[in-house]
Amino acid sequence: YEKLMPINSGHKDYVVIVASGYNQGVSPVPLKVYVGMKDRLADGSKIDYATANERDSFLARNGLLYGKLYGMAVENTTASTLVEKVDPGAKMMEEYLKNPNSPDQFAARWYPTSYQWGGWDKTVAVKDTEMYLWKKESEQPKGYTFFNGDKKAEHPAGDPSGLPRYAQNMTKSGALIGVDFGEFDFGNLLNLGNDLPEYLTSNVIKMVPAVDGALTLELGGQGKVKGGDASIHMEKNKAQMIAPDGLYWAKTTDGDYLIVDEDSGNDFGERKYVLTINKDMQVKSGHLLAISGGKHSSRYAQGVSALGGAFTKPGGNEFSGSCPVTALIAKKADGSFYTVEELQGTARQEIRGSKSLSEQTYIGVVQARPESSGDVEAKGGDAGGQIFQFNIKLK
């Protein structure tokens, strides 16, 4: 997996974890979430913490001993409006995202396959888990089909408010979708809240399609590159997302924003940008934050690097995520910093949510393999690059 991200289940007995990534390198596969029940052993029975070992106690408390992976599935009639042919063996999600005329939203359910982990003494080979089951006809839920796509869907980002919804980078196609569960119903049909749900329900929003013209970034007079600028992806010559990887959702007094890192090997400089979204998870605008590296980099043409003497040769860079530190450096009315105890639970987001976007502070990272000589090589470093702090002031 690229990222395992818990989202608020709204229920004391259940956990929900977005499981984005690679399905062991096998396509097609749907987007997935893990649903687990707390205080249960692998067979579903109640755990006795008085006799359980430390490992199982920890896993059971967090709902990780008893659960299943649930994949996005679409009712067959609805699916026929999204793609030309409903086929679990095809990359339907990619077809949907690349079609400029496909619906902007659709309803989906999330169903498990027949596989469920049976415990430490019943472990099977990875190939015998759910990884090959999503496309099998016999595994399709009655009246529904798993809405399979490419294995490469990298970072998700959850709504910081705690609402059960998230944005998902569709890395292979170059798109962004939103998933809104509304309110989880763990007691649907005959379950009555005493076991894992038969399915989850959600609304899916196409936030940025994988279509040329879908995204042109505002530059604020910056972002010049060889022969053009970074308002579009210069190497691909397309005004769209290309290989979006890192993703962070910021909720401020100004509204909601998504910070995106592309990982496309852009010869004209990898892009980091911020998308402004509304309450319905619709993208309203995009602004360039930074570009880095690329074989056409003017910095690399001069043989310079962030760490002196580390330049090797021109090549691609990669931004690697954004970490909010606003609450860690914020001060109280008396001028003192918040204590560790005061920053527990939702406190950090409450502090961030009380400030405007321009008052937020983030830490970012650039992986720069073209800067891997000198001290980086001498110390056996994986790659050069830099750690940087940044603020965002949109104009």
Regions found by a protein language model. Name each.
Residues Y1-K395:
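Conserved small-residue
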